[in-house]
């Protein structure tokens, strides 16, 4: 993080830290530092499945094909290789979170907490940040943060109206990502109390 934060800030600007994955990384580090299960559980319920999709999409693009377009930036040769290499934390973070969840326990409050946080981030990205395909003075600045305009940063989706897509996107995240992850973690992971008793 000592390297990643200043490098990302310089190249991508502060709005880059509004991506779910970057918020998740920051929460994970603070959670590790403070030994707080809730701070680990929040990103776990929110990004375990999306980061798995990121990994699959990256491998597909590495093989010369396109799946969702969400990792296209990793193959953008206008961006320094070192900068793109820093983004490989996406592939490691899910495994770290799983390790920490089993160690510290899964806090059931994470579902409501992450849903509120993610919804707020989506609204900020939709109303205040550049949309997909926007022409910016600095081409490195983030567009389409958290995919609120579609899965491709190069152009907005055209399946439905932008506002309807936003509402649908948030609903799908809750129904298809956060809820299943919550129930899975609730089933297979200890509670913070159980984890603490086991460590004692």
Where are these regions (language model features)?
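Membrane-embedded alpha-helical segments of multi-pass membrane proteins
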Residues: 17-30, 88-93
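Short, aromatic-rich membrane-interface segments at the entry and exit
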Residues: 13-20, 38-43, 110-113
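Membrane-interface capping segments at transmembrane-helix boundaries
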Residues: 180-199
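Short, hydrophobic transmembrane alpha-helix segments
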Residues: 5-14
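Alpha-helical membrane segments in multi-pass integral membrane proteins
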Residues: 86-92, 111-133, 139-146
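Aromatic-anchored segments of alpha-helical transmembrane domains
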Residues: 1-6, 48-57, 118-130
